[in-house]
Amino acid sequence: MEIPLKINPLPNTPIDESFLNILSLEGSDIILGEQTSESLVIPLEPSPTTMFGPRGACLVSETGPLWVCDTGHHRLLGWKHRPERDGQPADWIIGQPNFYQEGQNAKGTPQANTLSVPTGICACGEGLAVGDAWNHRVLIWQKLPQDNNTPADIVLGQADFHHNQVNRGETDTAAERMHWPYGVMYYQGKLFVADTGNRRVLVWNQLPTCNGQPADYVLGQPDMNRRDENGGDSPSAASMRWPHGLAIWQNNLVVADAGNNRLMIWDGIPTKNNTPCQFVLGQENFEGAELNRGGYFPTSNALSMPYGVAVTNQWLIAADTANSRLVGWKNNLSMGATAEGLTGQSHFRSKSENRSYGSCDRNSLSWPYGISSCDNTVIVADSGNNRVLLWLGK
């Protein structure tokens, strides 16, 4: 549905601007998190119904289960089935001894069932993968957890479950080391990890089967031992500054390069080290890196710290985090293409949290961090509002 807008124009803003709604105009189908839809957001004590800055969520199938990275509470929350009402309490917890405690690694040392700033999460084979960012590792469950504090089966980035040093304590990085791995994705047997602090994406050609297994190839760096932002040079078609979310759009790899304020899109799935992408969205060329293309206000072709990316129906959707909105593109994409779709703001030139810096409602967003999809449901980690939204597509 195309909606003509009549707005008070900001500088260089068209008086009439149109866009397509990416998600249902009725707002979120389900809101998870304790506050009501009109309440002010405050940090929340841990419980089965509260979250603090969630950054990722995965609905495994339309009927569930649902797993959420409750990032600020250093835990995963699990629902056995797709939640059916707002504020529905979680059934399972991983990372803390109970629903009412918090702390990195449960205020202890790293274990196979503890977490420190969990961020990325995805279904992985028959199980689950989680970017356990501040433990500098990725945890893999070979089967979906079905109980509290189920331990992971495999760890990547560390030699075992009991260490958590950056790059295993070394100055340089390597194929088996990590620094703040924020994003994870599994596609056609391959595991992709946004090794954010090392400014790269690591790829395993098959699902790893042993602890500390090295990646097969790297994107964003010339080789496995480099870790400089943008490969030590200016932004390019191959370099990254702060890679985060990952998705597949029409069989093409997409990486949300938040630090360069862009989405990188490859021609197909790259299979070799440092393969350059085909084009970017959010910048007019490969060399651009400024947020909102150097402007204070966003536009329909600019981004500001896009941390998340997902695909649903016909849409490629970016969680344009610092602009507190979702923006979407459809077919025939090219360098710097203008977005057609918008959710979370009234027009493309607005970036206010919850539309007007006020309280949240079913249609508003505040620093949406992670985004994923399952059939016709888009799952948004609305981090600034301490909640997760299950939102139906158009």
Question: What kind of feature is each model-predicted range?
Answer:
Residues 42-59, 107-124, 169-187, 232-249, ...:
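Signature of short aromatic-glycine-proline-rich micro-motifs recurring in repeat-based ectodomains
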Residues 19-47, 88-111, 151-174, 213-236, ...:
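Surface-exposed loop and turn segments in beta-propeller and other repeat-based domains
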Residues 324, 367-394:
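Blade-level signature of beta-propeller repeat domains, shared across WD40, Kelch, NHL, RCC1
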Residues 71-72, 81, 133-134, 143, ...:
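Short loop/turn segments immediately following the C-termini of beta-strands
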